[in-house]
Amino acid sequence: FQKMNILVPLDQQMGDFNDVAGQLLPSAMSTAMVKGSYYALALNTNTKILFYNADALAAAGIEVPKTMDEMFAAIHTLSGTNENGQQVWGLNEPALAGWNVLPYIWSNGGNITDDACTTATGYVNSPETVAAVQKLVDLYADGEFTGFNSGDIPMTDGFGTGRYAMMLEGPWKTAELSGAYPDVAYGT
């Protein structure tokens, strides 16, 4: 639409644009700029954080992971079965389609494209990117990482009942947990 010149720059149409934009994160607002003009307001961002079951980590003698390697080691240690013989997964990720896989790739030093988003070859197939994706495949194959199948335990319920020891999710999950599982001891 921008190439067709049918979009109207918000910063030229809104008298209070600078006041409104000044209340938003500059990094998020940078995604709304095209050729020196703003065409949108970045009203929300999506930050993923690690939620961990504090009791599960304590029982396993594990410190809160601070690196990806520590997180992968914790996933392995926390996976298995509970006292009722039910499977426990070290990590739940709601989906790895699209952008959800990117934090794993970026944390491993990989990327999908060059900075200009014009070239994928050499990035999406870089050793760092491939290794990050392979690690997720291995965790799934070993039963340490939840699947993406119909009938999987919903994220909040799995975490709240101890079937998922850790999860990567946004800060909105705290409201869900406090409402549905107020007695679960967890950290972020």
Tell me what each language-model feature is.
Residues F1, N46-I49, A56-L57, L96-W99, ...:
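Solvent-exposed loop/turn segments at secondary-structure junctions
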Residues I6, L10-Q13, N53, T67-A74, ...:
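Stable alpha-helical elements in mature extracytoplasmic
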Residues S30-L43, K48, E70-T121, Q134, ...:
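Extracytoplasmic/periplasmic solute-binding protein
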Residues M4, A56-L57, A73-T77, I153-M167:
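Short helices/loops that flank or line small-molecule/ion binding pockets
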Residues P103, Q134-T188:
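Extracytoplasmic/periplasmic substrate-binding proteins
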Residues D55-P65:
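Aromatic-glycine-rich donor-binding/catalytic loop that engages nucleotide-sugar donors
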Residues F1-K48, E63, F72, Y104:
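Hinge/lid segment of periplasmic solute-binding proteins
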Residues I75-T77, T118-F148:
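Glycine-centered hinge/linker elements that transmit conformational signals in sensory
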